[in-house]
């Protein structure tokens, strides 16, 4: 007897799937964010997904492997979004570090987490 698969997903459920879904089904929808520099940045889900894939490739070139930890030290904006999705798409563990912390605190957090990349 064959197992019934019903409508079960045939792919792993990953955070990066959210951005891929948006790029496929709402490719031209704009993502709008205000940059630290003060201006407004606009691009599409298609562009964001492409840049997240490039971030994933950069992590691979840096020697990151599935399960490695990477830290972001960034303000909340489009660049942070790309790093977040690029890391999760590479099966990396991504955590944020508050840029307002003192350098000693940032170093302690990154060392304690055993980050591969900051």
Residues of each region from the PLM?
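A short N-terminal helical cap/helix-turn-helix that marks the beginning
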Residues: 10-32, 50
């Amino acid at each position: 007897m064959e197992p019934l698969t019903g409508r079960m997903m045939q792919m792993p459920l990953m955070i990066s799937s959210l951005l891929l879904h948006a790029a496929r089904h709402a490719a031209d929808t704009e993502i709008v964010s205000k940059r630290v520099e003060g201006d407004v940045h606009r691009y599409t889900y298609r562009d964001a997904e492409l840049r997240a894939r490039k971030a994933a490739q950069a992590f691979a070139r840096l020697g990151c492997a599935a399960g490695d930890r990477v830290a972001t030290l960034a303000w909340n904006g489009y660049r942070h979004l790309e790093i977040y999705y690029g890391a999760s798409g590479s099966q990396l563990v991504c955590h944020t570090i508050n840029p307002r912390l003192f350098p000693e605190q940032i170093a302690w957090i990154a060392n304690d987490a055993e980050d591969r990349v900051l």
